[in-house]
């Protein structure tokens, strides 16, 4: 089918060991996962279903609900319906899910976490809820989930924001 061909073609064009695929959207109603290729800046959409295996970075089974925006995943294979066979959290990145002591130096494109400095690149994805935001929207009250490779930040997700109080 055309769907299968598209999925296999995408799988071949995306699947390089060096590629970093950042989850930009998960739609459980349509069973789709959109990923952003950090290396190329290109977005891809994959379908998943009952035959898709979801795994953590150690290879242990998990649920699709354990994958979130900002996670880095590896996607491989396509079944006869063109759905991904395996979606696994990447072991090529580090994750810190509870960052509260941070600051952003916009001039240097640096995120300071505690006493350590990390680079914010042009392709670093920053999420708040379902929105993609920029560093200007981060506040000291936010709690962040940060994903990186060495000293480079790949993605940031605001897990708890300062919010607003509506009276």
Segment roles from a protein language model:
Residues 1-50, 55-122, 127-167:
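Short, flexible, surface-exposed loop segments at domain boundaries
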């Amino acid at each position: 089918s055309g769907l299968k061909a598209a999925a296999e073609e995408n799988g071949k064009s995306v699947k390089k060991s060096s590629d970093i695929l950042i989850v930009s959207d998960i739609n459980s109603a349509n069973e789709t996962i959109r990923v952003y290729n950090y290396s190329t800046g290109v977005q891809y959409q994959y379908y998943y279903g009952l035959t898709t295996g979801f795994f953590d970075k150690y290879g242990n089974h998990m649920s699709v609900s354990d994958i979130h925006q900002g996670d880095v995943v590896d996607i491989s294979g396509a079944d006869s319906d063109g759905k991904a066979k395996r979606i696994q959290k990447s072991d090529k990145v580090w994750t810190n899910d509870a960052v509260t002591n941070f600051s952003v130096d916009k001039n240097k494109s640096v995120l300071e976490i505690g006493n350590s400095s990390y680079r914010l690149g042009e392709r670093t994805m920053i999420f708040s809820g379902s929105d993609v935001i920029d560093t200007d929207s981060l506040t000291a009250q936010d709690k962040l989930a940060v994903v990186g490779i060495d000293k480079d930040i790949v993605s940031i997700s605001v897990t708890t924001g300062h919010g607003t109080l509506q009276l």
